[in-house]
Amino acid sequence: MQKPVKRSLKERRQQVLTVLTHMLHSERGMERMTTARIAAEVGVSEAALYRYYPSKTKMFEALIDNLEAHLFTRITQSVKNETHTAARVHNIMQMVLDFARKNPGLTRILTGHALMFEEPQLQARVAQFFDRLELQFINILQMRKLREGKGFDYEERVIAAHLVNLCEGHFMRYVRSNFRHSTQQSFEQQWRLLERLFA
């Protein structure tokens, strides 16, 4: 009889995050996540779960860190591959919305729905993610004058805030519709309105 494969601490931690993500996407994803529920889904005792993560807050922080690292790695690569400002902004927005569509459980974290019963520091951590996204847009918009010799009719910070608000609005609608209304739905039509900012 084969012995069960012993997983490393890193593999176990990743398993916990994968299970938690699936739970957030499930029908019970809006319910409070308890360590007992998470441990049961992972197939370990609560005591064992705490060996992988000292608290539930740390699990959520790890999820946010992972999604942020993944998205901003892709955003950095996209910016390197494209020099035109409008195309850069379009590609980033499309990437962010596509990420949300493919990761509904994580989108519940970004909207704050999954964090309603959790530590306030997690809401602050999500706010940092959106602040970083806004700063990325500001930098790209401000570079337009140097790259293309053109400015905007509005302050770059105002435009960047609007772009982030649009992303957040798509996330909220996606979660509110129980993931039926895709984040990508009607984006290209909405982009045609935004495109006028770059004329």
Curated annotation (Swiss-Prot):
Its main location: cytoplasm. PROSITE patterns: HTH_TETR_2. It comes from the Bacteria. GO terms for cellular component: bacterial nucleoid; cytoplasm. Residues 34-53 bind DNA. It is found in: Cytoplasm, Nucleoid. GO terms for biological process: cell division; negative regulation of division septum assembly. Residues 11-71 form the HTH tetR-type domain. Pfam families: SlmA-like_C (PF22276), TetR_N (PF00440). PANTHER family: ACREF/ENVCD OPERON REPRESSOR-RELATED, ACREF_ENVCD OPERON REPRESSOR-RELATED. Homodimer. Interacts with FtsZ. NCBIfam families: PRK09480.1 (NF007015). HAMAP family: NO_factor_SlmA. Belongs to the nucleoid occlusion factor SlmA family. This is Nucleoid occlusion factor SlmA. It comes from Pasteurella multocida (strain Pm70).
